[in-house]
């Protein structure tokens, strides 16, 4: 792994004030520094102020799990990119498979959210990936190509440089299933090559992380693959020791 490693924890809809305080404090204590790697936690909206309070001035960044594609307006229940920056966020996840599947977010909407994030100087963590049915139909590359092309078509390839791409095989999310390191590497290489068709320098530099049931006991093997630069971590990010171990595995 020649690029700097990156690990982001996605807490999803878990946590409370007491648990968060303990978890964040443990992560800060466990990660005083990283060599050629960085890490972040993406927390539920109500806990952004808490994350900011605990993490400010540490080696751990923080961010959100979703944003509206709109900057402001009569959009009840929505949260804008600018609101996240008010809480010091550096990152935001866009296009997570759960957003696409449960809330009907299509490629165009995800592209608009990506653009909205960058307009407010947030780094989007763009999720791409295929379902089990799509994989079994040998449609993995076509699906991911459409997801990437929607973003590049809207913002241009230069904007991709200021982002992180997360490959999440939907069939491996929360199931305990994990793509083999080689299966994950093959898709990561495809993503990098797809970007390289537009700009090889950007493709060489961009961080592409893996988001399919990464745990402390498989992180090192996954991150050793040449095109896997870290992970987007779900359940394991809620356990301090697991998350810390994964972050250290991303060092190079």
UniProtKB/Swiss-Prot annotation:
Where, by residue number, does substrate bind? Answer: 10-12, 174, 213, 234-235
User: PROSITE patterns from the entry?
Assistant: TIM_1, TIM_2
UniProt main location, coarse = cytoplasm
Q: Where in the cell is it found?
A: Cytoplasm
Locate the active site: 96, 168
Keywords of this entry: Cytoplasm, Gluconeogenesis, Glycolysis, Isomerase
Pathway assigned to this chain's UniProt record: Carbohydrate biosynthesis; gluconeogenesis; Carbohydrate degradation; glycolysis; D-glyceraldehyde 3-phosphate from glycerone phosphate: step 1/1
Gene Ontology CC: cytosol
CDD domains xrefs: TIM
Asked if the keyword Ribonucleoprotein belongs to this entry, the reply reads no
Q: Does the keyword Isomerase apply?
A: yes
Short name of one Pfam family: TIM
Tell me the PANTHER family matching this sequence: TRIOSEPHOSPHATE ISOMERASE
Q: Subunit details for this protein? A: Homodimer.
> What does the UniProt function comment say about this protein?
Involved in the gluconeogenesis. Catalyzes stereospecifically the conversion of dihydroxyacetone phosphate (DHAP) to D-glyceraldehyde-3-phosphate (G3P).
Q: Which family does it belong to?
A: Belongs to the triosephosphate isomerase family.
Q: What is this protein called?
A: Triosephosphate isomerase
Species annotation: Nitrosomonas eutropha (strain DSM 101675 / C91 / Nm57)
């Amino acid at each position: 792994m020649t690029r700097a490693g990156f690990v982001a924890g996605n807490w999803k809809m878990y946590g409370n004030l007491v648990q968060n305080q303990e978890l964040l404090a443990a992560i800060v204590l466990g990660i005083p520094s990283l060599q050629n790697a960085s890490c972040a936690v993406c927390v539920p909206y109500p806990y952004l102020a808490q994350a900011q309070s605990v993490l400010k001035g540490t080696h751990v960044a923080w961010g959100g799990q979703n944003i509206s594609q709109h900057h402001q307006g009569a959009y009840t229940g929505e949260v804008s990119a600018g609101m996240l920056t008010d809480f010091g966020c550096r990152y935001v996840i866009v296009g997570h498979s759960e957003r696409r599947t449960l809330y009907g977010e299509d490629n165009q909407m995800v592209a608009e959210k990506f653009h909205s994030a960058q307009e407010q100087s947030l780094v989007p963590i763009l999720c791409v990936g295929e379902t089990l049915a799509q994989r079994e139909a040998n449609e993995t590359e076509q699906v991911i190509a459409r997801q990437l092309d929607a973003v590049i078509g809207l913002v241009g390839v230069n904007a991709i440089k200021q982002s992180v791409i997360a490959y999440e095989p939907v069939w491996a999310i929360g199931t305990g299933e994990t793509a083999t390191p080689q299966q994950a590497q093959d898709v990561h290489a495809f993503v990098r090559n797809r970007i390289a068709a537009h700009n090889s320098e950007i493709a060489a530099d961009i961080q592409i992380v893996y988001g399919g049931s990464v745990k402390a006991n498989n992180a090192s093997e996954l991150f050793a693959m040449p095109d896997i630069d870290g992970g987007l971590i779900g359940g394991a990010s809620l356990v301090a020791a697991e998350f810390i171990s994964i972050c250290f595995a991303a060092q190079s």
